[in-house]
Amino acid sequence: VGGDSAAPSEKANPSPKPTPLWDRSPGSVAAVGDSITRGFDACDVLSDCPEASWATGASPEVDSLAVRLLGRTGAARRSWNYAVTGARMADLPGQMAQAVRRKPQLVTVMVGANDACRRTPSAMTPVSAFRADFEDSLRSLRKALPKAQVFVASVPNLKRLWSEGRSSPMGKQVWKLGICPSMLGDADALDSAATLRRDTVQKRVEDYNKVLKEVCAEDKRCRYDGGAVYDYRFSTAQLSRWDYFHPSVNGQARLAEIAYRTVTAKKPLT
């Protein structure tokens, strides 16, 4: 320091707190994903019920993430659901392209179950392709909306859903229509081949969740649920009474709670 330098002021103004990267009260929400976000089988058999969606639904019984963040009127005006029943990770870039047109402040992502729910385990989406499409989706979002936030839900524990749902004779009949055959096919079979098949699917779900966590962690405006959806112990009350696999209205409300907790937390969940 040179001799002519001014002495530091004793009452230096405190530097303003930096604006946090994560806004815990975003002003608009766009949802992308699959049948869970469409409320499939929550209200009627083999039908979407977007009003019961955990992300953007208007149902008072669900109290969706959008309603919790924006209020009922705000959610009706500033939340959009671009999820599609049957969607896989390969469909996410296209859904994201639709969502960015709305310029949402928060995008919710719940996808991956259909990548594991194939006719056979060998038909499941490879982990490398799953990662590439997720990275592509976040990259395109970031390019269009640099400050948009992302909530990423983990893929549910499909093996637990099999374990819970197989106690229902009606549920098992609906499963035969082709709901997640890689996990739910031959639901009562407990031989070594069936056990290996289910364990293979379960391992793939865990690998998908690892990808979701890792890719999200690379983006400062992305929050993963810390595995909360995967860890949630769905009971029959939280499962559709038609297929005992998709969330019921009660189950959708639990998903909304998990999402709201993650989005409004002071620090990201790990």
Segments predicted by a language model, with ranges:
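Flexible, glycine-rich phosphate/dinucleotide-binding loops
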Residues: 38, 88, 159
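Serine-esterase "nucleophile elbow" of acetyl-processing enzymes
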Residues: 3-80
